[in-house]
């Protein structure tokens, strides 16, 4: 039971980290897209 709960906690933690990284990448890509659009519009 203890090993299973530790494995479940580890998997949940990994999933949470992957989710955070995915959100960071999306925000980073979105900010880059906004910068590109602003540059093209002003130019």
Curated annotation (Swiss-Prot):
The chain crosses the membrane at residues 9-29. InterPro entries: NS7B_bCoV. Coiled coil: none annotated. Signal peptide: none annotated. It is found in: Host Golgi apparatus membrane; Host endosome membrane. CDD domains: ORF7b_SARS-CoV-2 (cd21623). It comes from the Viruses. The keyword Membrane applies. One of its GO terms (cellular component) is host cell endosome membrane. It is a single-pass membrane protein. GO terms for molecular function: identical protein binding. Keywords: Host endosome, Host Golgi apparatus, Host membrane, Membrane, Transmembrane, Transmembrane helix. This is ORF7b protein. It comes from Severe acute respiratory syndrome coronavirus 2 (2019-nCoV).
